């Protein structure tokens, strides 16, 4: 609203005005305003957007502006490399090709509007599944100084057991002898162990990979780098490939599956409950160049508290079911987005 807007937002927008993103337009964060102004309330737009008011059907033009072909015409007129941008005057020189038939415009826009709503619904489903999984993870695991988690699985009442990390896992220090493996991995907090090339679009590893640790599918790695939301680093299991190599800055390990279930442990490390064990042995102030000052010995001396193997497997099965639903929802959401892009290519020139 106008009274709440910053000084750079000075232009009053009206119902059905289209706001086109002028900075980094390839992101397609465009918007069609659907709220009428009143005598007591006016809406304004940032100067980072071009304000478009059309005599054609607004929804139809909005979808046309989101096509890849229109975006290509915009990008060739942009200036700047890191933050490519187009001004309103240059944007106005782009020719639009569209059907003048208002009935056809209406049918096309209604179809694409319905698809947009379905995509938004699917995104909400995905987000809700992520929230559900995160909430369960925080309830069914507990830190080493807590007797039991907030929630126990029905039918399981036996006390949890506290273990040193060295009791249920062993360090991996196998080097990539003879450069057997060339796939360099990195830990991305949200995506797990992934190819460095695909994540950074380049390799930042040494040319000589013989000194790197060799990790196999199902084994774990701890990244001592901390970042916003990950104050104690991240632990991830290698799931997406058979093997890869990691910098010696990582602590790599495999688990004893007679004590801890692999899937259970994977979800445990998605929780915050293991942070307590690490904070008990780490020097809070010892953070060097973005790395926690945690020695290998200290790391394997951290304490963790787990239920019986039977309860672990039930917890893992429950969380795996939610994860599968989440994956299916993500795939379906991607199908809807691809369907929309296909329709945009077919319905607009």
Model-derived features with residue positions:
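Short, solvent-exposed loop/turn positions at domain surfaces
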Residues: 6-7, 80, 113, 203-209, ...
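Hydrophobic aliphatic residues
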Residues: 23, 65, 140, 168-172, ...
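Non-catalytic DNA-recognition/assembly elements of restriction-modification systems
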Residues: 152-177
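A short beta-sheet element
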Residues: 8-68, 211-274, 287, 295
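Proline-centered turn/helix-capping motifs that create local helix->coil transitions or kinks
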Residues: 141, 173-178, 273-278
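DNA target-recognition patches
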Residues: 1-6, 169, 173-206, 245
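A short glycine-rich beta-alpha junction/loop motif
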Residues: 26, 41-48, 79-103, 243-249, ...
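Amphipathic alpha-helical segments with low aromatic content
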Residues: 90-95, 99-161, 310-349
């Amino acid at each position: 609203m106008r009274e709440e807007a910053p000084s750079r937002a000075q232009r009053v927008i009206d119902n059905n005005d289209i706001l086109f993103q002028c900075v980094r337009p390839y992101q397609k964060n465009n918007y069609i305003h659907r709220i009428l102004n009143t005598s007591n309330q006016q809406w304004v737009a940032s100067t980072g957007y071009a304000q478009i008011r059309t005599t054609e059907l607004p929804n139809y033009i909005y979808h046309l502006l989101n096509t890849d072909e229109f975006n290509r015409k915009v990008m060739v007129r942009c200036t700047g490399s890191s933050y490519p941008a187009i001004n309103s005057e240059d944007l106005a020189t782009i020719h639009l090709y569209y059907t003048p038939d208002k009935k056809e415009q209406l049918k096309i826009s209604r179809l694409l509007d319905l698809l947009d709503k379905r995509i938004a619904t699917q995104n909400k489903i995905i987000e809700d599944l992520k929230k559900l999984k995160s909430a369960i993870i925080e309830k069914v695991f507990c830190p080493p100084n807590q007797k039991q988690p907030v929630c126990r699985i029905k039918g399981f009442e036996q006390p949890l057991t506290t273990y040193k990390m060295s009791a249920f896992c062993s360090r991996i220090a196998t080097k990539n002898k003879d450069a057997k493996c060339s796939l360099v991995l990195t830990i991305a907090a949200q995506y797990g162990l992934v190819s460095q090339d695909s994540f950074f679009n380049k390799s930042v590893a040494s040319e000589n990979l013989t000194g790197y640790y060799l990790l196999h599918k199902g084994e774990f790695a701890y990244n001592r780098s901390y970042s916003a939301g990950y104050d104690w680093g991240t632990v991830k299991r290698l799931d997406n490939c058979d093997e890869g190599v990691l910098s010696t800055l990582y602590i790599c390990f495999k688990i004893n599956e007679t004590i801890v279930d692999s899937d259970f442990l994977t979800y445990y490390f998605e929780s915050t409950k293991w942070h307590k064990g690490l904070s008990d042995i780490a020097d809070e102030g010892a953070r060097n160049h973005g790395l926690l000052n945690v020695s290998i010995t200290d790391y394997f001396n951290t304490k963790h508290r787990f239920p019986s193997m039977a309860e672990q497997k039930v917890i893992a099965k429950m969380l795996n079911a939610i994860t599968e639903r989440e994956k299916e929802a993500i795939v379906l959401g991607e199908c809807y987005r691809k369907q929309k892009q296909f329709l945009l290519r077919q319905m607009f020139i």
